[in-house]
A protein has these predicted regions:
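C-terminal motif of bacterial Sec signal peptides marking the signal peptidase cleavage site
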Residues: 15-18
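N-terminal segment of the mature soluble domain
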Residues: 32-77
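Sec/Tat-exported extracytoplasmic proteins
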Residues: 53-57, 104-108, 154-163
Length: 168
């Protein structure tokens, strides 16, 4: 009976890996993206990049000379705006917007992607009740983190696409 449970568990794990299943946030990096140098990123973006690369075999390097790719952050913009009001005039729903403008350079300093912008958005409901203020603040913090992570995934996808064009 113990053998059959173990066999079922092993078979389930094999089927998961065979279907391409991977953990959320895990990214398969091409060789040129395994070492990246990040220039001029905010602390929040730097943290999201570190988390993304920690889940892979990639590494963030401290010098552009060591990098297979260079991410040059040109501009970052974060905004929270009201998208609906209650009958008493308080904000009920907010939209969070994160916009990242960047260049991607290869290891020789050649531009792969120039002046690209990624914009990610999310919204959340806030009833403005004193009992939920703290939880809504925490919800916004989590959503901000997810927006940064989404932007990082988009940068990596664009980098991968450009590398496929360069090295088919």
């Amino acid at each position: 009976r113990l053998v059959s449970r173990s066999s079922v568990l092993v078979m389930a794990l094999l089927m998961l890996t065979a279907c391409g299943y991977h953990l959320r946030g895990a990214i398969d990096l091409p060789e040129a993206l395994k070492t990246i140098y990040v220039k001029s990123a905010s602390p929040e973006l730097s943290t999201a990049i570190e988390r993304a690369f920690r889940a892979t075999t990639g590494e963030i390097v401290t010098s552009p000379d060591q990098a297979g790719m260079i991410l040059n952050v040109l501009d970052e913009y974060f905004q929270r705006r009201t998208i609906s009001l209650s009958s008493t005039g308080f904000s009920n729903e907010y939209e969070l917007v994160y916009r990242l403008t960047f260049d991607l350079l290869d290891s020789e300093g050649n531009t792969l992607v120039s002046n690209q912008t990624i914009e990610v958005t999310d919204s959340y409901f806030n009833a403005q009740r004193s009992s939920t203020v703290l939880s809504k603040d925490n919800e916004e913090i989590v959503l901000r983190k997810e927006l940064y992570e989404s932007a990082v995934r988009s940068v990596i996808q664009r980098a991968r696409a450009e590398l496929m064009k360069k090295f088919p």
